[in-house]
């Protein structure tokens, strides 16, 4: 595979929220983010949101040279965030129970998703809007139990990461493409998808003992981008 320079890369920063100070993180977000956090019912959801948003501001600040609390975001019609004054800086944020991950790149649109590996998905509830008919058939033919749950988790995170990269809604975007290979018989840890006359790369893997991450990016040259890790003690994957 052709090598990739650091200038053509995705930087991932992530961690477990228990490793960060909630008080310090609270002071690292702006008032509308604090208001959003206060509306969340579960304390762990509040903590994950507060830590993730403050770390997003910190990481973007180091890249663009703007103080964290001065960074301004805008959103498209589907809620995808971008920077007001730095259109070439692309980022994506995902958080789940006690963990978060941030993807940042200067090169291309990017999306990331993280899920707790032992999260239980009810296939019947999500299949109708999340998976194509081929994907539903594939999952239904798997043995019930751990194998099906692992494949649902992999499929879900890959599709959500790509939808975030595309900047569309989950409901309208997830069924517009299939993650399965051409034979509709397996879900790959690395794959490329043609969507809307563009090429997107997807890569997935386990991180730490209990989390699963997928990253999607627009990859016009059919080259897997270099994944660079910052402050993550257990690297997820590295492609070059």
Residue ranges and their predicted role:
Residues 1-240:
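Core catalytic alpha/beta fold that binds nucleotide/phospho-ligands
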């Amino acid at each position: 595979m052709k090598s990739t320079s650091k200038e053509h890369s995705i930087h991932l920063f992530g961690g477990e929220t228990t490793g960060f100070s909630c008080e310090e993180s609270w002071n690292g977000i702006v008032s509308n983010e604090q208001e959003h956090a206060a509306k969340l019912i579960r304390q762990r959801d509040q903590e994950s949101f507060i830590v993730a948003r403050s770390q997003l501001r910190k990481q973007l600040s180091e890249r663009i040279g703007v103080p964290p609390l001065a960074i301004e975001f805008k959103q498209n019609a589907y809620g995808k965030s971008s920077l007001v004054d730095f259109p070439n800086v692309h980022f994506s944020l995902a958080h789940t129970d006690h963990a978060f991950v941030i993807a940042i790149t200067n090169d291309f649109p990017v999306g990331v998703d993280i899920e707790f590996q032992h999260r239980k998905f009810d296939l019947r509830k999500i299949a109708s809007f999340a998976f194509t008919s081929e994907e539903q058939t594939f999952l239904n033919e798997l043995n019930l139990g751990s194998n099906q749950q692992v494949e649902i988790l992999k499929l879900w995170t890959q599709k959500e990461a790509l939808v975030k990269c595309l900047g569309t809604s989950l409901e309208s975007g997830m069924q517009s493409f299939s993650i399965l290979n051409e034979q509709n018989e397996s879900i790959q840890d690395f794959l490329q998808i043609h969507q809307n006359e563009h090429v997107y790369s997807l890569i997935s893997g386990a991180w730490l003992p209990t989390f699963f991450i997928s990253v999607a990016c627009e990859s016009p040259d059919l080259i897997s981008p270099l994944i660079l890790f910052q402050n993550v003690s257990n690297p997820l994957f590295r492609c070059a």
